[in-house]
Amino acid sequence: KTYRFSDEEVKVMQTIANDPRVSGQNEVYLNFALGKAFEDRKNFDLAFSHYAFGNSTKAALVNYDSDNTTKQTEEQIDACDQSLFEKFKNMGNEAADPIFIVGLPRAGSTLLEQILSSHSLVEGTTELPDILTLSGRLRRKGKRQGNKPYPYNLHDLDVKTLRRFGDDYMRDTEIHRTETPFFIDKMPNNFRHIGLIKLILPNAKIIDARRHPMACCFSGFKQLFAEGQFFTYSLEDIGKYYKDYVKLMDHWDRVLPGHVLLIQYED
């Protein structure tokens, strides 16, 4: 983020990038680096050209389906209705320790975590995979013959199972924390599973770290992520993902009023 390429380094990268033998992930690395180099030099046209080429090359290497993401968003809205939360109100693990920071990448979640964890009662951890792992298990279970798909199968869980899921989360995350009363889980994609979170951890705090769509989406477009976040490699896909995100967060506000705190980055 802070490294500035020298003119000589830029020339070398340009030479390598023009070599027809360079392809695939190496081509991605070079073009994102050149995009950063020319952005630092305020040559924004050339910077965008390299970012765009790097992103399109990366997009061809990954298997991302924006229509499937929209479908999953609609399924969450349809399945996680008011009746689900009334049926299982306060039935999971009662711990109030977890603070979930959700949203999109590049929306300020790290800064928010740093601010919160500066308090003596709050501990920062990392982007914990536990909720995504659990939702994946439920999704695989739903694909078996005769089972309802996730998230519709949440309606078929019982109190014992919900509590066990909450207990498992608290136990499995112990390795990432000490005895501090509250800890932060800042996996941004957890916003897709707030319904599941509130069923198994009804007293958990949830914060939506939100940033202006132009700033958030373009920042994601310029970022080559170490893994995941495949929606960021196309401006069209980023826009659709942001729209799905806002639509789903609006739904959580309707069915779980007062349970999600919105923090706007620009404020």
PLM region spans:
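PAPS-dependent sulfotransferase catalytic domain
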Residues: 125, 130-158, 176-267
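Alpha-helical solenoid repeat scaffolds of the TPR/TPR-like class and their adjacent stem/linker regions
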Residues: 1-177
